[in-house]
């Protein structure tokens, strides 16, 4: 799979580089977070949310909606699933990382997806990008053996456990609050996750 830069014109349909917020303090704080041998996602970290930039993100980017700042860290070279939200997500790279992205418009009527349509983009350390709500994504991939550290910023409550059962049509894809998931049969995901047609590898 060819890897493009987030500054490439191809990235524009998936998101954009954020240039009007100073993320330097958050980048430094992220460097202190753990990098496991697999992948770990934490939706909300109090120490990150206590940084002054959190209020700026709420005001400037999310229109005064409350947010959560967590991280996705570790080592990964596979795409085992794709997910999307009803809101944009900010990814801030504390290390170089690769995002594998696709378009929700390419999900079929039976809620499957062909991963050969996805494209990979390198996000350099210190850069932050908006990932549009209509962009399919999942855990980043590392670019070297040191692994990756990526801050994940979303509206508060996203990716937390559901309060009710969901089934039928797109509703069946809802696996957590504000999280619709299409999974791969070999991806180690919960039974019942919808199955994608292909599988990507970087």
Stretch-by-stretch model annotation:
Residues 1-125, 136-199:
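Active-site region of the double-stranded beta-helix
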